[in-house]
């Protein structure tokens, strides 16, 4: 990345606006004022409050329950810990391995799930963890701190200036957390980087760990803004707003002790933003052991897999269901009469009435406008996981069309179930998941995926390393009209190409995908990486500070 991206300076800002000393002096004044107020506030907290009262009570309970002295308090900052999504799975698996690592480890969860009249208790939350993720946790060593100000990090609270509003909200929420119970280690598993300066400047040194799912601002966002016609005070104001925000965001990296990301795409962006060469990737726990075990127990004999593709994705526009359906309709029109058509199953959850309306619009559009026969497409909403497992075990292909999805856990679930992934050639699916792999455990040591894909379809026989197929679309924001058409087909053409593959090719690739998913994305792999990249370094850091 060039200096235009990494080395933001006020000369650039002034060049946009013609400001001379005004912008610089104003920002310096604001920064100095914040520093002074922070110092005054810390002194007031130290002299007027007893922020360790809850911690003392908690430690007494922890010692009584686990029978260990000198416990270490790991504070997990996750205001929406009961949401039940992929981010929460990371949280609870990290909690699980942290507890199992050492009997002296105690967990504090900073959560806002106990307010706003919600009928939620710690027991409810841990029961949900068991039901949703099948993790049995030692509840005697898990404590919850209620955050009454969680609404300050909700995007609906900030109708305008959402980025800075949520940033300020996270700082306040971090202070509400730490003033009730300061931990020995602060771990943010949800992605609120503006909370780190509050933790770093508290009454004592607290190591900070971040597990980042995606950056809150990226080069892509800034490049998109810079390409806008620079006319009018509104555009100039947004440039200043985003540049100053990015400048502050960059400075936060110095506050963090351990930086963990969930994918190569996120890791590359975070390295560029925080100028850190120590970022580590820990892939989310995908429980591939359970899917592979289910497949082995209730396996699919030859001929039992159906000629169908499943789309496992929440019903939200960014998942690009419309693109998939439209491509499928084009595929059906171009399919020779002698070839059996694939059936398409759209399976996902809905969160609101808006999502329900979205599904209905897709159904109406596919039936009334695109004229897709009803027996070739179905929409399955909010299925329990056992029904999803059956669909995965019966299907042959799994489709994911999201552009620049930072990871893509559904794609991993496809592979663990022995499916052939058909995915968009970007971010997580391209860089991390559907990568070449052979029986010797070699990952990504082959030519680029698009070259392998061309060779695969040219020979129509298994090559021992391909794990899935890619497409790109002219509607992609970053579509290269010169290179991309030569490398990747569009989705409708890819549907046509996969109809040429015989059963043996698909069976061999599906079996390879299962072994690959165990090797790279299992819960056990997450446990090992969390121990190596987080727990062991933190223990060394705490020991050094005790000696120092």
Curated annotation (Swiss-Prot):
GO terms for molecular function: alpha-1,2-mannosyltransferase activity; GDP-Man:Man3GlcNAc2-PP-Dol alpha-1,2-mannosyltransferase activity. It comes from the Eukaryota. Residues 1-20 are lumenal. Residues 42-160, 182-406, 428-548 are cytoplasmic. It catalyses: an alpha-D-Man-(1->3)-[alpha-D-Man-(1->6)]-beta-D-Man-(1->4)-beta-D-GlcNAc-(1->4)-alpha-D-GlcNAc-diphospho-di-trans,poly-cis-dolichol + 2 GDP-alpha-D-mannose = an alpha-D-Man-(1->2)-alpha-D-Man-(1->2)-alpha-D-Man-(1->3)-[alpha-D-Man-(1->6)]-beta-D-Man-(1->4)-beta-D-GlcNAc-(1->4)-alpha-D-GlcNAc-diphospho-di-trans,poly-cis-dolichol + 2 GDP + 2 H(+). GO terms for cellular component: endoplasmic reticulum membrane. Present with 3140 molecules/cell in log phase SD medium. GDP-Man:Man(3)GlcNAc(2)-PP-Dol alpha-1,2-mannosyltransferase that operates in the biosynthetic pathway of dolichol-linked oligosaccharides, the glycan precursors employed in protein asparagine (N)-glycosylation. The assembly of dolichol-linked oligosaccharides begins on the cytosolic side of the endoplasmic reticulum membrane and finishes in its lumen. The sequential addition of sugars to dolichol pyrophosphate produces dolichol-linked oligosaccharides containing fourteen sugars, including two GlcNAcs, nine mannoses and three glucoses. Interacts with ALG1. This is GDP-Man:Man(3)GlcNAc(2)-PP-Dol alpha-1,2-mannosyltransferase.
